[in-house]
Design a protein with these regions (language model features):
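Accessory alpha-helical/coil subdomains and C-terminal extensions
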Residues: 1-136
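C-terminal non-catalytic interaction/assembly regions of soluble proteins
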Residues: 100-259
Length: 259
């Protein structure tokens, strides 16, 4: 599912950027992406960049400490340079003391009432307070994991192969194992199917290597891009009915309760 979610995130951020560029005024769009303890999906936003657009201009992951003052400094520089700025942030960004940015009363309304919310909304209030320019936050939320119309063919292929490998493991008497894919090469993209004891991965977070985050803590490296690109490759044909994406019959999941 990661490759498909990454594909949706990168595509959506590119579309948000194109929409933003229409307006000739200084603006900031903060996109909050899933990732409480690991920033892989937020890192995937880098794939939105092309020869016409550098969005997202800033990327913040939870693997490194987030500094609000440095964020405002970074943002000022980007607004001065590009006018319209797109920022990608993980929902789980924390300060140097390990406190979630979204858990602080970063801003209060004019009556002094704390406005507590997610990381994106918290930073939106901060930008309004410090810069006073047009700013909005967008919480991608559940959309990033259910956009079936924008699935990655690589992702789908690997899902089926993983399922087949799981059957082989079961037939061989293996149990409490998770199918895993071990990358052999980025280009050409090659990997091998293996398995890992569930006890080694359950309730664990596989963090982004800090070496794949730039020293200034607001972007990712070429190594990250090389890792991500193969995972979003390929398009899955989508069926449509009456102009709307049409999926499997899930009537067995849509019971009517209370009757």
């Amino acid at each position: 599912g990661f490759g498909s979610a990454a594909k949706y995130i990168a595509s959506s951020i590119r579309e948000i950027a194109y929409d933003t560029y229409i307006y000739d005024l200084e603006s900031v769009n903060i996109i909050e992406i899933m990732g409480r303890d690991a920033g892989w999906l937020t890192a995937a936003s880098v794939l939105a960049r092309n020869e016409f657009s550098l969005a997202p201009h800033l990327i913040y992951l939870p693997e490194v400490a987030f500094d609000k003052e440095q964020f405002i400094t970074d943002l000022k520089e980007m607004v001065k340079k590009y006018k319209n700025v797109i920022v990608a942030v993980s929902e789980g960004i924390r300060d140097k003391d390990g406190n979630y940015i979204s858990a602080t009363d970063a801003a209060a309304d004019k009556f002094g009432h704390a406005q507590l919310s997610g990381a994106g909304k918290t930073l939106e209030y901060l930008v309004k307070e410090k810069l006073g320019i047009k700013v909005r936050s967008v919480e991608v939320n559940v959309l990033q994991r259910c956009a079936g119309h924008m699935a990655s063919m690589t992702d789908l292929t690997e899902s089926f192969l993983s399922g087949k490998h799981a059957v082989v493991l079961a037939k061989n008497g293996e149990s409490a194992q998770m199918v895993s894919l071990h990358r052999l090469s980025n280009a050409p993209y090659t990997y091998e199917l293996s398995n890992t004891p569930v006890s080694e991965v359950a309730n664990q977070a596989k963090e982004v290597p800090v070496s794949w985050i730039t020293p200034d803590h607001h972007d990712v490296t070429a190594e990250m891009i090389a890792y991500l690109k193969p995972l979003v490759a390929g398009e899955v044909p989508t069926d449509y009915a009456d102009g709307i994406a049409d999926y499997l019959d899930v009537s067995h999941l849509t019971k009517v309760y209370g009757k």
